[in-house]
């Protein structure tokens, strides 16, 4: 069942699926920001978001900085 699968996922990874997916997307975006000169809007779409401002909000919640700040920081 869906509930059992969700339980197993959380037991295995330590986080629910949505948090895992968000973390994965932010990590992919960080890599693209470090290694490409793509616009934030393009990266947003590539990692699965359709709204740039929402993506920037999620990114900032996870990293403490906006995508543009992250790119400029050379982290």
Q: How should these model regions be labeled?
A:
Residues 15, 57-75:
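…primarily DNA-binding HTH/wHTH and HhH modules…
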Residues 1-2, 50-51:
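Short coil turns linking two alpha-helices in DNA-binding domains
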